[in-house]
Amino acid sequence: AKIYTRWFFDLAKSGGPRVNYQAVGSGSGRKAFIDQTVNFGASDDPMKDKDIAKVTRGLVQIPMVGGTIAFGYNYDCDLKLSQEKAVQVAMGMIKDWKELGCKPGKLTWTHRSDGSGTTKAFTNSMEAFSKTWTLGTGKSVKWPAGVGAKGNSGVAGVIQNTPGAIGYVNQSYIKGNVKAAALQNLSGEYVKPTVEAGAKALNGITLDE
């Protein structure tokens, strides 16, 4: 959402039209587009045939930008997560930071409470990481534990204000007390969600036609 806010700010500043863009989550945004209460939307999760069929005015989907999703956390630890440990954290199975090689302390899992393309992408990864993951994939899932918050900003806010909290957010929300964990990739290396790492990953994908 931040990049669209910046683009539309620059557009208005240069004499162009003013665009009212609101980050409401992919679930709400998709419904608003289908109901024709907005002119366009953006999501990390492209619309599928079932929803496209509901758009009577027609639909064009354009790949715009790519980004990374981070495990953001607020704790005194240089956190490195294996794929298995990442899944266990997100499943609410890990309650203490010592289980992740950090000093002992309460771990609080934080997740999205609204329908979210970020959640869809995140759960896709969790399912690919380990058979331990049993929540399926989607814009929303039934989290067995943790604190829910609306939007990337909401999750980042909980982490920022809760020592010992960890959750998933877009890379652009990694700031202040919210640090990014290094996550194990397919090669076994531990990588942080930087612009460079994200660009390298995006160069290796093939977009659907």
Which residue ranges define each predicted feature?
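Exported/periplasmic ABC-transporter solute-binding proteins
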Residues: A1-E209
